[in-house]
Every structure is written in structure tokens, then in C-alpha cells.
Amino acid sequence: MTPRSICAVCCVLCCVLLLAACNEIPIEQSPIELPENVQSEQGSEQMPAPEQSTQKQTAGVTTSAPQTEAPKQTEAATTAPPATGEPTPASGIVTPGEKGYTYPEMEEDLAMLQETYGEHFTYESIGKSVDGREIYACVVGNPEAPRKIMITGGIHGREYLSSLVVMKQIEHYLSGYDTGSFGGMRYAQMLEDFAFIVLPMINPDGVMLALCGIESVQTPEVRQTLEKIFADNTREGLTSAEHINDYFAYNWKSNANGVDLNRNFALSNWVDVKTGILSPCFRNYKGPRAASEPETQAVSAYVQSLGEIEGMLAFHTAGQVVYWDCGVKGAVRQETFDLAQAVCEHTGYKFIYDEHLDASLNDWMTLDLGIPTVTVELASVIYPMPTSEFDAAWEQARELWVIAAQFFGE
């Protein structure tokens, strides 16, 4: 076995021991915490489809928006064979690490992908996090392509599985460039016609806190800030974790300032967004002002520099659901509905309408920039999420770039 394989086995054993010991730890944990947009599935509203329906060709199946109900769930398309010569989830460049998928592991993988597939892959830093880590953006495919699709992951710290899946998607399409295809679309043609703009880990500080705890902090000032947030959240009854690293592992979604980046984008009516949290916290604090955080500023500036973007798939965990709409009207609402429907039909995930405004990246891009976006919530287990969840999440998400390309290619 390679050292990384041995680390992966150790990680699984550690997760088993951790889960077995959870009954002894007085901290927040739930079998499935649905994404922050809703309190429970029962509290989510299924919204009737738009009155006018357009059709899109996705994975060889023509779909149309129903008039009165959400799309019927179909069996997830998870049995398609990998492209010839494609690495399996447990092999290749991008694989789960000892702790999950850390920022240094991502940096190492980005460098290896550049070295191996540099003809069709580039990456750059678009800014720095609170604790001084680079925020990377990748271009997969033809950088001069007339159409761009954005893929994002890792905006919430404890949702590091989303970064792993997004990075594996990059390798999947690059390694299968010459021989791979899905639903009648060749990867080579897809990557010639589209530039996929990928932000694999928007919140590197949050990911490192969730995986490696307070020891991952690089600067004394940031450590002092985080220790104060933990003390304040404990005093306010927002956490019952006895140790700060349990607090991070089970709870942490925010950046190193205690701001939830997916509540911090400069939505035109940001001041009206209510999250219920008024000070730095492990989640849902929207910050002192719109786009106050360096991560939010970097992503916003980069998105605006790209020009026209066809759409975005934002990967999160957990819940195995797809969120769409966020209250958008007109043609963008219809296109967002159809995109969400295509993703649901491929993955078998639940289709959820959500008009609640969060000042998320999706809200800002869809409502203010007019770009169709959907949120794909992978996996369905407690935090900290074991890497054993990766295989199932990967099978469901593997071909979603193709689904998006077929959708926007019509």
C-alpha cells in the first residue's frame, strides 16, 4: 500500500472510533443536518413550476418543467462506467487524505494536475483568506471557449467533502479527455466548447479548522479571535462542546473571522437579510457589512472579471437535495428551474424550492447578476463527515459537468 492509502485506512478507523465515542461527547450532532436554508424537510415548500416551460436536452433525455409539481425523482444515474483508463475514486492524483481533504493536500493535487494535464488545465490565486491562505481558481478546458460554467466547493468549513468531489471532477474529465464520454457527449468536445471555472475551496481557513482544529491557525491574532468566538458561543449557549477542536469539527462553517461566507455576498438588499445570528459564530453570522471578508471580496471580483457565465453548480454537504430559485423572476427563474430539474433527474436527489434570501454566492449571482445557479447538497451523515461518504457522493456527482454542458449547450 502507498503511504496515502495507509493514511486513508487509518482515517476510516479513526472515524469509526470517533463515531463510537460520540455518545460521550456533549456536543451538537444530528443524523442529517439539512442545509442552512431550511429547518427541516417538512418545513420546505415545494413551489409550483413556472407557467412557461422550456426544454433542455440532458444526458440524452428531453425534460420539461411540470406545471404543478416538482419533478419526479428518478433512480440516480450512478452506474455509468468510468472512461477508459480513468482513475478510480481511491486512485489517481486526487484521493481522500488522512483527515479528509485538507488545504495542503489540495495544493499538492493542483500542482500535480497542472504538471500532468497542463494543456487543458491552469490555476491561479485570486486572493488570500483571513489567515493568509491562497484562494485558488482553476480553468478546465478551453480558456478561450465562448461559454463558461462555474463550479464551486468548500465555502463552508466542515463541508470539505465538497472540495474533494470538485477536485476529483477536475481529474476525471482531464484524465478521460481523449477517450471519455457520457450521454453521447465526448469529454474532449465538452472541454473544447466550454471553459469550466472551478473554485474548489473558497474557505480554506474554515476547512482547516474543521479538519485540524485550532492548531491549524497560522497567526496569533487569528487564534485569539477564534478562541474568543468559542468562549462567546459557549457562554451564549450556542455550543456545548467542551473542547475547542470538537467545536470546530462538529460545527464550523464560517471563515476565521467567524463570518459565514455564504451570508456575506453583496446582495442588493443585503441589509434586509436576517440570519438570527448577530455576532461572530460558527455559522450564519453575515458579517459587519456586505462583502466584509477577504474571501468574499476575492470571489466577487473574480466572478465579475469573467464576463458572461452560463451558470453555476455550487457543491455543499449534506442532505442529498438540490436547492434552486432564491426568489428570482422571469426567464432566469425558468432556466434555474430546468437546471435544477436536470441535476435531480441525474442524481436522484430531492428537488427543493427555496425563496429564502441568505446573501449567499448563489443569491448574489442569480438575483444581482442574472446567472442561473443551483446548490447541490452531497451526502447525508453526521459531522465530522467520514471519507467513507466520498464514494457514494462521487458516483452521484461524477458526470454533473456533462449534465450542465448538455443543458447550456442547447
Model regions and ranges:
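Bacterial N-terminal signal peptides that target proteins for export
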Residues: 1-10
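C-terminal motif of bacterial Sec signal peptides marking the signal peptidase cleavage site
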Residues: 18-21
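Bacterial lipoprotein signal-peptidase II cleavage site
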Residues: 23-30
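C-terminal accessory segments enriched in acidic
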Residues: 24, 35, 89-100, 265-410
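Ser/Thr/Gly/Pro-rich low-complexity, disordered linker/stalk segments of secreted
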Residues: 34-91
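Short glycine- and acidic-rich boundary segments immediately preceding or forming the N-terminal edge
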Residues: 82-131
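Structural recognition of the beta-strand scaffold that forms the well-ordered cores
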Residues: 123-127, 136-138, 148-152, 162, ...
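Active-site/substrate-binding loop(s) of hydrolase catalytic cores
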Residues: 161, 168-325
